[in-house]
């Protein structure tokens, strides 16, 4: 059993800062910034989760929505400078959350090709917003981190959506058998 001082020391070790003894520290930091960025803004966090949920709830677009969103995110991130001058992306980001929420809660039904197109447009806006928020010009490491973080959130949303589908299916089965 650890004495109380050792417990505090162990806790301190767990919370220590990253060692900066590596030659590729800028790449590591850049990757971490990209990875954490989708988690730090509520609009981006909600959008990624809702995309995953929408994909789970829409059988015809299960794979295409996350892939189109990720590709649009990449395009938007890489075209940040041009998109920044061409449009104000923040209203598009907020609008995407509203549209994705309507799709999840079933208040809006649109055909799958239009749904995929909307997701692509909103993804480009999200990518531009992410690219503008990064501390420097988007590089390979930060962009890879951004895509991985976004796909992780979409996967969580997909799992939640699948669980919801299963729950609804089981509820229908119990109603039919009783």
Q: Where are these predicted regions, by residue range?
A:
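Membrane metalloprotein/metal-transporter helix-bundle signature
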Residues: 2-11, 17-178
